C-alpha cells in the first residue's frame, strides 16, 4: 500500500531536500501572543 517501508528513508529524503537548513532565523512576520505577568495571553480579532 505505501511506497516507503521505514521512517529512516523518509527522514533521509527530507534532509536531502531541505539541506538541513531548519528554522534558525526568526520570521519577522510571525505573530506572537503578548503575555501578561501571570502568563495569560489575550488577542483581539478584528473583522473588516
Curated annotation (Swiss-Prot):
Transmembrane segments: none
Keywords: DNA damage, DNA recombination, DNA repair, DNA replication, DNA-binding, Metal-binding, Zinc, Zinc-finger
InterPro entries reported in the protein's UniProt record: NA-bd_OB-fold, Phage_T4_Gp32_ssDNA-bd_sf
Any Gene Ontology biological process: DNA replication
Any one GO MF annotation of this record: zinc ion binding
Additional detail: Interacts with the polymerase and the uvsX and uvsY proteins.
Function: Binds preferentially to single-stranded DNA and therefore, destabilizes double-stranded DNA. It is involved in DNA replication, repair and recombination. Binds ss-DNA as the replication fork advances and stimulates the replisome processivity and accuracy.
Subunit architecture: Homodimer in the absence of DNA, monomer when binding DNA.
Protein name (Swiss-Prot/TrEMBL): Single-stranded DNA-binding protein
Source organism per UniProt: Enterobacteria phage FSalpha
Gene name as annotated: 32
Amino acid at each position: 500500500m505505501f511506497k516507503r517501508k521505514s521512517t529512516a528513508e523518509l527522514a533521509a529524503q527530507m534532509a536531502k531536500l531541505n539541506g538541513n537548513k531548519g528554522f534558525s532565523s526568526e520570521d519577522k512576520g510571525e505573530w506572537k501572543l503578548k503575555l501578561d505577568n501571570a502568563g495569560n495571553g489575550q488577542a483581539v480579532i478584528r473583522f473588516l
